Amino acid sequence: MIKKEFKAESKRLLDLMINSIYTHKEIFLRELISNSSDAIDKIYYKALTDESMIFNKEDYYIKITTDKENKMLIISDMGIGMTKEELEENLGVIAQSGSFTFKKENEIKDGFDIIGQFGVGFYSAFMVADSVTVISKALGSDQGYKWESIGAEGYTIEPYEKESVGTEIILKLKENTEDEKYEDYLEAYRLKTIIKKYSDFIRYPIKMDIETSKPKEGAEGEYEEIVEEQVVNSMVPMWRRNKNELTKEDYDLFYSEKHYGFDKPLKHIHISADGAVRYNAILFIPEKIPYDFYTKEYEKGLELYSSGVLIMNKCSDLLPDYFSFVKGMVDSEDLSLNISREMLQHDRQLKIIAKKIKEKIKSELELLLKNERERYEEFYDSFGRQIKYGVYSDFGQNKETLKDLLLFYSSKEKKMVTLDEYVGRMKEDQKYIYYASGDSIEKIDKMPQTELLAEQGYEILYFADDVDEFAIRVLVDYKEKEFKSVSSGDLGIEEKDEKEEQEEQTQGSKEVFAFMKEALSQKVKDVRPSKRLKNHPVCLATDGDVTIEMEKILSAMPNNQEIKAERVLEININHDVFKTLKEAFDNDQEKLKIYTNVLYNQALLIEGLTINDPVEFTNDICKLMS
């Protein structure tokens, strides 16, 4: 027996793999199981091309056994095995893949998948083991061999009597440290958890001897401990099954088992795609918003599998931010992985899959909106805010994709409507899509600024979410109809005779408004007669792009930029209050100053804004009452 050195920068490369390539030590088991699956696949492929061979899938499995006394973990398979030369070539050269060579030599193309494309997964065993022993007998060979190594120093190969074809890997686990309990890898529960997480859908049975209890024969009420062999993996991924054979209960159970949420999914989307990139996916739209959805702890992304082996728990690149609420998984045989099998080597395939998934989610939401309106509104109640974020984020580049998924409360319908529904029933001469912003539907419904539009039968969209107005500012228009706030200076509905009448009424009142503007100093841009008020005496309007509601939202942000709306105090000249203002202007201008401040503060309160000096406000009211 001669000790040999590794051929590929030995210590440096092995140290790099053990310490840098893999994120979690538990991944070693995934790699070794994947190698065992590859070995059985090779027998299957040979049987396809060799009529003298019979391959019965039920006869092949992978076995995990433990020896707690000697701290050994054994992974064995009934695969194709390795000759002495193959042991030296595949295990003696780091980054030499036997699966890759086999695939190349046999010209295996589409339709047959071998998981291992690199030759480094085996060496992940050294993350948890002081020494690794491989006992293997190749198909068609009379002699078995034993390969042993304690790490970067090298390895030995010697003949070994092995009865059956296949490979056995024996890991002598490391001693426990403060940071890692290596003996946990000898516990059945820990091993089953790792297998379920990463290798549940390996296509061959993974068997373990599990200790369990059963009623003792002839002794009522007594139990005895027995050890029985159990299959611990599912083998057949749900996403590869025929959709028509699956029920809603099947999908709900999968959602629960994968711990995607504590609720039930509102909708599932099952994709089986062939084309430039082949992939399967099962996606879920949750029924309720996750408790941590709007926190920094929330991670978006889908589980990513490569040929049934879990590669990433959360692949964020598969979902745009505006669909970050979607849960589920994607499995593809066409991904190019890096040597740790944990990350993508390049993302061309992933971008194709992500684009298709985005389009599918959108189309399914459109169908839900069209065919199951009530369920869509349930979804929108939970996740509509995220859709609106999607409209205005990234400089509006997604607004065309998302605009038809938006819903807003309608003053006329008293329910949620789409922009298309609103525009479809606009008056023939209507120039704008009207909206009103506020803290709640109830408060918006009472806004003085809506009086004129409501009286003339115009439909108003109510924006009660702080992101609404930002979204439509980015949207700009819908079907060539611009959005217009009910607080804007020009509502675009004034008739010529109305304009002449108002000008006539206000001719003798200009001095009153000028005095009031002076009294309010820098608080408002202007004081003017209102064209929109019918019953209320006063309201705030705005000139410019920033509305009162936008000012409130921006001022509440951490990086308060002191962005202010150009406030205009509007007075209803047909209200009795205006007569009082005119009388005060003619007879007691000090009282007019008090009236002006009271009306301005009243307008602030209606808008939900803070009064700068509440004490002065209450004193003014008392003065007027005394």
From Swiss-Prot:
Gene3D superfamilies linked: 3.30.230.80, 3.40.50.11260, Heat shock protein 90, C-terminal domain, Histidine kinase-like ATPase, C-terminal domain
Q: Where in the cell is it found?
A: Cytoplasm
One Pfam annotation, family name?
Answer: HSP90
Locate the region C.
553-626
Gene Ontology cellular component annotations, sorted alphabetically: cytoplasm
Alphabetical keyword list: ATP-binding, Chaperone, Cytoplasm, Nucleotide-binding, Stress response
**Region of interest: A:** 1-341
Name the Gene Ontology molecular function terms of this record. Answer: ATP binding; ATP hydrolysis activity; ATP-dependent protein folding chaperone; unfolded protein binding
Q: Which residue stretches belong to region B?
A: 342-552
Which PANTHER family does the UniProt entry name for this protein?
HEAT SHOCK PROTEIN 90 FAMILY MEMBER
Q: What does this protein do?
A: Molecular chaperone. Has ATPase activity.
Hey, which family's this protein in?
Belongs to the heat shock protein 90 family.
Q: How does it assemble?
A: Homodimer.
- What this protein is called in its record is Chaperone protein HtpG
Native species of this protein?
Answer: Alkaliphilus metalliredigens (strain QYMF)
